[in-house]
């Protein structure tokens, strides 16, 4: 019994594919930021330019969407964007694992955003935060109905926030695996002479599309976080 418990405790600390590749992603982010800011120059190099471009892009997004008072939370949003982006890109490496295709990973991030902005809304505005659900511009008879819809849509946010990212990352990889399954057909049949080149071209096209999707999904998750932050900072309709 004692030995069994020891094994279970040991296995608890064994890293999974998800934790391993998330750790690699964090190390890559740290490397980018350290190398990009280590020797700052007036005429930036490639890595410094990449770091500054990413920083400026997210800084402007937070300011435009959440307002200047939302810049207080810029470090968190910037870190979130980089983590998702690098996790998405890591999945494009052959034999690698995509942490953001795991609903447990995206679910934790989405719930963190949801709980954080909700707590922030109540801390800053108290009960006035509930004005977010009261559409004062609508006709009075419709306001209670719209309030119920707003409440439901608010609590659905973490679900849609997490599933959108995980689903898109998982779907793209699944399609690539389907095309890859047709690639070896040239070894087994005459039909493969036609099918295999088409499969290879499809894989290349899908890979290029997945690079775009990796960035777009990181952008979508981040900008939605900014929108939710804006609702917490300025809850009135």
UniProtKB/Swiss-Prot annotation:
Compartment list: Cellular chromatophore membrane
One Pfam family hit: ATP-synt_A
Membrane topology: Multi-pass membrane protein
SUPFAM superfamilies, alphabetized: F1F0 ATP synthase subunit A
Keyword Chaperone tagged: no
Record bears the keyword Transport: yes
Keywords on record: ATP synthesis, CF(0), Hydrogen ion transport, Ion transport, Membrane, Transmembrane, Transmembrane helix, Transport
Listed transmembrane segments: 18-38, 77-97, 103-123, 132-152, 185-205, 209-229
GO molecular function, one term: proton-transporting ATP synthase activity, rotational mechanism
InterPro entries the UniProt entry points to: ATP_synth_F0_asu (IPR000568), ATP_synth_F0_asu_AS (IPR023011), ATP_synth_F0_asu_bact/mt (IPR045083), F0_ATP_A_sf (IPR035908)
Database matches in PROSITE patterns: ATPASE_A
Gene3D superfamilies linked: ATP synthase, F0 complex, subunit A
GO cellular component, as recorded: plasma membrane; plasma membrane-derived chromatophore membrane; proton-transporting ATP synthase complex
Superkingdom of this protein's organism: Bacteria
Assembly information from the UniProt record: F-type ATPases have 2 components, CF(1) - the catalytic core - and CF(0) - the membrane proton channel. CF(1) has five subunits: alpha(3), beta(3), gamma(1), delta(1), epsilon(1). CF(0) has three main subunits: a(1), b(2) and c(9-12). The alpha and beta chains form an alternating ring which encloses part of the gamma chain. CF(1) is attached to CF(0) by a central stalk formed by the gamma and epsilon chains, while a peripheral stalk is formed by the delta and b chains.
NCBIfam families in the record: ATP_synt_6_or_A, PRK05815.2-4
Protein family (similarity comment): Belongs to the ATPase A chain family.
HAMAP family: ATP_synth_a_bact (MF_01393)
Function: Key component of the proton channel; it plays a direct role in the translocation of protons across the membrane.
The protein's name in its UniProt record: ATP synthase subunit a
Gene: atpB
């Amino acid at each position: 019994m004692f030995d069994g418990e020891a094994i279970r405790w040991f296995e608890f600390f064994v890293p999974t594919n998800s934790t391993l590749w998330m750790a690699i992603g964090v190390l890559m982010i740290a490397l980018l930021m350290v190398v990009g800011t280590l020797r700052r120059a007036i005429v930036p190099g490639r890595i410094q330019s990449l770091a500054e471009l990413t920083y400026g892009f997210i800084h402007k997004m937070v300011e435009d969407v959440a307002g200047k008072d939302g810049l207080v939370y810029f470090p968190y949003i910037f870190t979130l964007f980089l983590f998702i982006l690098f996790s998405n890109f890591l999945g494009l490496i052959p034999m690698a694992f995509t942490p953001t295709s795991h609903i447990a990973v995206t679910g934790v991030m989405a719930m963190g955003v949801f709980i954080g902005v909700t707590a922030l809304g109540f801390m800053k505005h108290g009960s006035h935060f509930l004005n977010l659900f009261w559409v004062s511009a609508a006709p009075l008879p419709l306001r209670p109905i719209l309030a119920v819809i707003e409440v439901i849509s608010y609590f659905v946010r973490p679900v849609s926030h997490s599933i959108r990212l995980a689903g898109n990352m998982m779907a793209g990889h699944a399609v690539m695996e389907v095309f890859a399954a047709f690639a070896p057909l040239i070894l087994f049949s005459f039909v493969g002479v036609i099918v295999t080149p088409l499969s290879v071209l499809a894989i290349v096209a899908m890979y290029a599309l997945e690079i775009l999707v990796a960035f777009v999904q990181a952008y979508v998750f981040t900008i939605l976080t900014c929108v939710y932050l804006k609702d917490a900072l300025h809850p009135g309709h």
